[in-house]
Amino acid sequence: MKYCRFATPEGPKYGEVTHRAGELWLTGFLPSPTSNSAEPCPPHPLSELSLLSPAIPSKIVCVGRNYLDHAKELGNEVPSEPLLFFKPPSSLLAPGGVIVRPKASARVDFEGELAVIIGKRARKLSAAEDLRPYLHGCTLANDVTARDLQKKDGQWTRAKGFDTFCPVGPIVDTAFDLTDGVTLETRVNGELRQHGSTADFIFALPALLAYITAAMTLEPGDLLLTGTPAGVGPLVAGDSVTVTIPGLGELTNTVADENS
């Protein structure tokens, strides 16, 4: 099932999403993101809805340098183990929301990524076991980064954690198949900047989940950002940045400078 989360006068709601004529449509209401059946409703294109982040995580676990070409473009060594960091839930941004370039940073970069939502409490998993019961679904994310602060600080909490620095959405696909790898692209103002495949992960999803859950418990709803391919670059006020993976729609956000 594919679903979205959107704002209504009565509060946030979940809705079933279907593809029609190349566009995503809301076709039913869901009582929760784990529901298996939807109450039919008159179809509405998602472009007419006020979309929200479909994930409400207790934590956002991210993987750095998980594509060989990205590690090389930044002049970094290829990690021998997954390189983990966090983004705070307060950094979440809805599809269509505005990424704010903080005054504290002179360079803010985009990083398009595949994101995985955890579906079942996970602790000390094995990469050899069937991990599908622990996966709720997949969505898109943009790991926005204050690149100058990342280099200056040495650790990444501030550079990755500003408000609006984690756009997520627009939909979740609970049956998304990662077996053969999927193509991820990022465009800025319509110009292709990133093109990669999850088949090129240095650490595949089973290895990531085993490594992460050896250290911490993942709760239902937690978000895992799996890394970004080569091509990252700066954003300036007025830009529009779009992350796409076939089947997951388009995650588009605009950019503005902090004004207060």
Model-identified regions with their sequence ranges:
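Extended, compositionally biased flexible segments
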Residues: 2-103
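Catalytic-pocket segment enriched in acidic/His residues
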Residues: 5, 10, 40-50, 54, ...
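Residue-level recognition of short, solvent-exposed, well-ordered loop/turn junctions
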Residues: 94, 109-111, 219, 236-237
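Glycine-rich, charged/polar anion/phosphate-binding loops
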Residues: 98-104, 121-126, 151-155, 169-174
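Short Gly/Pro-enriched turn/cap motifs at secondary-structure boundaries
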Residues: 104-108, 160-163
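Residues embedded in well-ordered beta-strands
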Residues: 113-117, 139, 185
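N-terminal accessory regions of nucleic-acid-interacting proteins
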Residues: 123-138
